[in-house]
């Protein structure tokens, strides 16, 4: 069954808006684990506007589920990942000033660089996922780079879901089938929500993991954190 990794960046945004350590992102991550999440995702950026590098170090010491670190593999990020040795690193080609991730890798054009990154992280025993648009050629390119998984950038699916969910999911099914055919694990993330999650998992039941942050933390303001984590897990289970 698809696993739920909760991105806690938005919790760090609230903390950083006031200074101090409230809310405590480590305490929140432990609570989210206790409420039933299968993993914790963080996306530290160079400007430290939400998750900071020290947060990542502190999280690795205490969480019991999988830690997934997302980010653009600049030198400082690579050094952090090799130091912390999470279960998974997800390589994302976002610019330093990007508000959020907005495109996947061109795994053909950047094959040499991505191959070197996969080789490096594998030496530390870290599973490597590459963030890609839902295009079979990008999925196959990730395989050629030596990745273990791809994460499909699901923003277009989420944006098109209300108007025509079948049309919205179609390119993702095609890309997911390409991943399965070439032996890649499969993740999904970006703008997945209570509205569109169940159908995504229903149509792509072999998806290994979804990473959800903004929508889940927003829903937690209305429903409470414990209830919200369990609501998302129920949406995933609908696809069984």
Identify the role of each PLM range.
Residues 1-70, 74-76, 80-86, 167:
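Conserved N-terminal beta1-alpha1 strand-loop-helix module at the mouth
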Residues 36-38, 62-64, 83-89, 123, ...:
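Glycine-enriched alpha-helix->loop->beta-strand junction motifs that scaffold or abut catalytic
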């Amino acid at each position: 069954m698809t696993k739920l990794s909760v991105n806690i960046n938005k919790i760090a945004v609230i903390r950083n808006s006031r200074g101090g350590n409230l809310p405590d992102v480590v305490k929140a991550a432990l609570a989210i684990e206790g409420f039933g999440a299968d993993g914790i995702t963080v996306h530290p950026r160079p400007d430290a506007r939400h998750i900071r590098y020290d947060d990542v170090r502190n999280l690795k010491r205490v969480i019991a589920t999988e830690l997934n670190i997302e980010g653009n593999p600049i030198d400082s990020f690579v050094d952090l990942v090799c130091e912390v040795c999470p279960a998974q690193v997800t390589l994302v080609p976002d610019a330093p000033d990007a508000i959020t991730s907005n495109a996947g890798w061109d795994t053909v054009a950047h094959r040499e660089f991505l191959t070197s990154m996969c080789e490096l992280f594998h030496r530390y025993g870290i599973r490597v996922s590459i963030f890609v648009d839902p295009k079979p050629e990008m999925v196959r390119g990730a395989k050629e780079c030596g990745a273990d998984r791809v994460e499909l950038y699901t923003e277009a699916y989420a944006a098109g879901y209300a108007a025509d969910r079948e049309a919205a999911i179609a390119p993702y099914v095609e890309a997911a089938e390409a991943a399965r055919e070439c032996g890649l694990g499969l993740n999904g993330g970006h703008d997945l929500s209570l509205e569109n999650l169940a159908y995504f998992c229903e149509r792509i039941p072999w998806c290994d993991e979804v990473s959800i942050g903004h929508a889940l933390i927003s829903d937690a303001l209305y429903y409470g954190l414990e209830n919200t984590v369990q609501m998302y897990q129920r949406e995933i289970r609908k696809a069984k």
